[in-house]
Amino acid sequence: MEFKRHNDFSEIDPAAWNALVEQSIADTPFSRYEYLSEWWKTLGGGEWKNPQLILVSASDNGSLVGIAPLFLHEYDGQQALLLVGSIEISDYLDLIVREADLPRFLPALLDFLASSLPETWSALDWYNLPDASPTLPALKAEAERRGWNYHEEIYRPTPRIPLNGSFEEYLSRIEKKQRHEIRRKMRRAAESGRVRFYVVDKNADIEPELEAFFHLMVQEPNKALFLRDVMRDQMSRSIRAAHEYGYLWLGFLEVDGVKAAASLNFDYKNKLWGYNSGVSRDFMELSPGWVLLAHTIQWCCENGRYEFDFMRGDEEYKYRFGGVNRYVMRARAIR
């Protein structure tokens, strides 16, 4: 295996990168070339100041085998190598490598990082690794073999709704009180004659829909604080990239022809990944946020999606809708 450090994302072919992602342990929207390369341009919407890119690829006979998208930054008392995308806006991160290649890729990667980087680093600090990622036991074993200090902890819950049937079948599995509440709110919205749910067409001009989404997002004070200019730029880049590559799912609920709620998701690998949302305060009597989420789950059921992933966060509504916890982890190895 031949390892190479790259100074820029443009040095790796996007098609080869994404083809590897789709065969890898990291097959999520957040590992794709278009997402991570755009993330790097704004450093996660201003999350990091002056990090150093450590983008490493491994090839066999000219064929891409693995990618370690890393950056160097002082963090938590160490000169740490973190995964590009860390920490706050990329819900799942991992090494980009086929599971069968991980046992030879990871030790060779660590050897390369230890021997070939002119920069001094003292830790690997990898956030948002899925709890089922084979990277976790592999990194633990490799760190122990090298005499490094290894620590692993739950970072955030990522509740998910398993879906394998009709919307009625889904409703039958959630708590009775919540089932009645969802049905009641959907029925009230429908009977008002004022409400329309729609999903933005994949061929639509995304710019006006993007503006409408941000307008709704900032109705919530915490999200308004979050969506400063550099973060808005970052999110716009991510949304445009997902739209260009065909996996953006942006749904709206209109009341009297006015957009009252928005749901931003990635429709990727036969599941919906719930990334963000926004709700107007003008139509709260119709519970537009709840009604839109219910319609979104119904859409998943009717279109054969096997799961709705709420992604990171333990907000109560996720569990009311039947979310079951999985987790993303933080793995830290100090040498």
Model-derived features: positions:
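Conserved catalytic-core motifs of GNAT/GCN5-like acyltransferases
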Residues: 149-158, 325-335
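Basic side chains
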Residues: 179, 184-188, 312, 318, ...
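A conserved beta-strand-loop-helix scaffold within acyl/acetyltransferase catalytic domains
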Residues: 2-86, 128-158, 162-284
